[in-house]
Amino acid sequence: MKVIVGLGNPGSKYKETKHNIGFITLDEIAYRQNVSFNNSNFEADIAEFFIGTEKVLLVKPLTFMNESGRSVGPLLTYFGVDEEDLIVIYDDLDLEIGKIRLRQKGSAGGHNGIKSLIAHLGTNVFPRIKIGIGRPSKNDTVIHHVLSTFPKETHEEMLLAVKKAADAALYACEGHTFVETMNQFNGK
């Protein structure tokens, strides 16, 4: 079983914000797979489908970004899923809008959702797909930047990054190792 987690905040207020790019990407995957999200006992909305014989869960934690691990940790334990079968998709300030970067492990890098996952999983070794949201302008704060929507002029680049991230996540679920997936999608 593979588990793809998109990080974001629940509620219509946050639906199209930069911080919700993980949720937006899971919506793209769900659309492609023709599946819908349902509420679960894990403080998350979950959709499921199969790629061949591989069951895939799409997970949107409903705990708000900073408590994502509270949802994901128990879910992985319940389903007996190891961290290497987890893929986390989230926003990254250090990447330009339209860019993605795949990593097998790493620190939280100041991202509170990842910090929560590391704390609840007890490891920083899990595959991740980072989607660029760019840095705030000099007159903007990080909090305002991540909780704002994408400027209209960057919408096309954002959608392209979402599609690339969805492609990468699905590729990893098709029997490819995450190293193969990184080689296929990093720098493209």
Curated annotation (Swiss-Prot):
List, alphabetically, the PROSITE patterns matched.
PEPT_TRNA_HYDROL_1 (PS01195), PEPT_TRNA_HYDROL_2 (PS01196)
Catalytic reaction(s) noted: an N-acyl-L-alpha-aminoacyl-tRNA + H2O = an N-acyl-L-amino acid + a tRNA + H(+)
Kindly indicate whether the keyword RNA-binding belongs to this entry: yes
| Top-level taxonomy | Bacteria, Bacillati, Bacillota, Bacilli, Lactobacillales
Query: What family does this chain come from, according to its entry?
Result: Belongs to the PTH family.
Q: Any one cellular component term from GO for this entry? A: cytoplasm
Residues under site feature: Discriminates between blocked and unblocked aminoacyl-tRNA: N9
The record's keywords, sorted A to Z, are: Cytoplasm, Hydrolase, RNA-binding, tRNA-binding
List the Pfam families.
Pept_tRNA_hydro
Task: Give the protein's recorded name.
Answer: Peptidyl-tRNA hydrolase
Pinpoint the site Stabilizes the basic form of H active site to accept a proton: D91
Compartments it resides in: Cytoplasm
The record, for InterPro entries, names: Pept_tRNA_hydro (IPR001328), Pept_tRNA_hydro_CS (IPR018171), Pept_tRNA_hydro_sf (IPR036416)
Main subcellular location of this protein, as a coarse class: cytoplasm
Q: Where does tRNA bind?
A: Y14, F64, N66, N112
Question: What does the function comment of this entry state?
Answer: Hydrolyzes ribosome-free peptidyl-tRNAs (with 1 or more amino acids incorporated), which drop off the ribosome during protein synthesis, or as a result of ribosome stalling.
Query: What gene is this protein translated from?
Result: pth
**What does the subunit comment say?**
Monomer.
Q: What is its EC number?
A: 3.1.1.29
GO molecular function annotation: peptidyl-tRNA hydrolase activity; tRNA binding
Q: Where is the active site?
A: H19
NCBIfam families in the cross-refs: pth
Record-level GO BP terms? protein quality control for misfolded or incompletely synthesized proteins; rescue of stalled ribosome
